[in-house]
A protein has these predicted regions:
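Conserved short hydrophobic interaction patches
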Residues: 22, 123-128
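Extracytoplasmic/secreted cell-surface and envelope-processing proteins
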Residues: 114-118
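M16/insulysin-pitrilysin zinc metalloprotease superfamily fold
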Residues: 6-38
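Generic recognition of short, well-ordered alpha-helical segments
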Residues: 17, 119-120
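Non-catalytic beta-strand/loop surface segments
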Residues: 1-11, 36, 48-103, 127-171
Length: 171
């Protein structure tokens, strides 16, 4: 998950407050109703992406470049079936496991320096509880036994050709 805030330097503290509130206190706001709403939102986003021209290409790439069981074999958003099956307790556990400062990167760019930012980051994120220690994902770089040629048919105005390679550091 990526969150971006584009704010003037004068709003840095407000942006840090908002992000620390999301990271540290969202769990209390998760309800059956809010989860149901978000499942609907994400399902619609998935359908919109799938129904765009060439929208199914990414799935074919992942499924054909990475073997079953590899963490990159499936698209991040999952399937509509996965989304429909998700329960409030699943969201809460995921939040507890992964939504913490020990599993996050905060990047500040622009007219700000470390001497200004560090005290504000400490102020707003200092009391946010760590999540569990997340073990590294086992994502070996697979080797295809032979070249693959996959042809997808879609109602699009132009042919598009994709050539994919799996390389170290990008897999």
């Amino acid at each position: 998950t990526n969150y971006f805030q584009t704010v003037p330097t004068s709003a840095l503290e407000s942006a840090l407050f908002l992000e620390s509130d999301r990271m540290g206190h969202l769990l209390g706001g998760l309800t059956e109703e809010s989860v149901k709403t978000q499942i609907g939102v994400v399902s619609n986003e998935k359908r919109q992406g799938d129904n765009q021209p060439y929208g199914m290409v990414e799935y074919a790439q992942s499924e054909n470049l990475f073997p079953v069981g590899h963490p990159y074999h499936h698209n991040t958003i999952g399937s509509l079936e996965d989304l429909a099956a998700a329960k409030l307790d699943d969201f809460k556990q995921w939040f507890k496991d992964y939504y913490g400062p020990n599993n996050s990167v905060l990047v500040l760019a622009g007219d700000v320096n470390a001497a200004q930012a560090r005290p504000l980051v400490q102020k707003w994120f200092g009391d946010v509880a760590r999540g569990r220690t997340v073990p590294p994902v086992n994502a070996p770089i697979p080797t295809l036994e032979a070249p693959k040629k996959i042809v997808l048919k879609d109602k699009v105005p132009a042919t598009r050709i994709y050539r994919n390679w799996i390389v170290p550091g990008l897999a």
